[in-house]
């Protein structure tokens, strides 16, 4: 099992991060959340997705919108204002989905978090605001997970480079790196330092940190939730 290690505060490395996030962008990231943003976040969810510990999915929010919309706004606004995820909002069920028929070990299962609907709304709004600046802070050679870019562009580029090398008789070497569970192995403290170096406002970084720090998880075993830990 992977265990996080303390990171070194490598100032020289962090100084290489360009400060590309300006005040105008930060003002957009920090602007007060509106009911329209909350409704857009809910409308962009799949209505019949399995609920989290609260038992509510997007369909419930849509049906009861006129009754609960103001309470939702208070909850989300307080989270933004305090930079915290309050109450049980960061509680989640953990379901293991088999990757194939021969799923007989933990590495053959994909963990899926079933989160509180309030948590989903907060992170949807945050992601919606964040995606508009990804193009400005992500290098052009990063082809995946950025709207408007295609991951296969880099594949074609590598194929062309290899073809050219073979055609011209040039000597060279190709190294392929595939990091197992790369997403889970990224150091969160390091990411927060990088965000600050990019120029993200400390308030926004704290809000992001609150969303992924100190979660409470209850594994689902044979359809029943084990104790939270």
Model region roles, listed by residue range:
Residues 132, 163-167, 217-218:
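Conserved helix-loop functional segments at active or binding sites
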Residues 91-94, 111, 171, 214-216:
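Short glycine-rich loop/turn motifs
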């Amino acid at each position: 099992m992977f265990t996080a290690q303390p990171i070194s505060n490598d100032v020289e490395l962090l100084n290489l991060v360009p400060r590309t996030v300006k005040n105008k962008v930060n003002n957009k990231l920090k602007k007060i959340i509106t009911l329209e943003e909350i409704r857009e976040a809910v409308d962009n969810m799949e209505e019949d997705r399995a609920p989290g510990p609260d038992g509510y999915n997007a369909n419930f929010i849509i049906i009861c919108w006129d009754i609960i919309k103001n309470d939702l706004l208070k909850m989300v606004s307080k989270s933004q204002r305090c930079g915290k995820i309050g109450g049980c909002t960061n509680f989640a069920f953990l379901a293991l989905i088999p990757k194939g028929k021969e799923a007989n070990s933990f590495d053959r299962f994909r963990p899926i978090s079933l989160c509180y609907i309030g948590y989903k709304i907060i992170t949807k709004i945050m992601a919606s605001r964040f995606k508009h600046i990804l193009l400005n802070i992500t290098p052009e050679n990063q082809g995946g997970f950025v709207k408007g870019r295609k991951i296969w562009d880099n594949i074609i580029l590598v194929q062309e480079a290899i073809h050219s090398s073979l055609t011209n008789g040039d000597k060279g070497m190709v190294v392929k790196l595939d990091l197992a569970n790369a997403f889970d192995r990224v150091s969160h403290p390091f990411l927060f330092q990088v965000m600050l170096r990019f120029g993200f406002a400390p308030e926004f970084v704290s809000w992001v940190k609150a969303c992924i720090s100190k979660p409470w998880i209850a594994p689902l075993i044979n359809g029943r939730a084990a104790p939270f830990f």
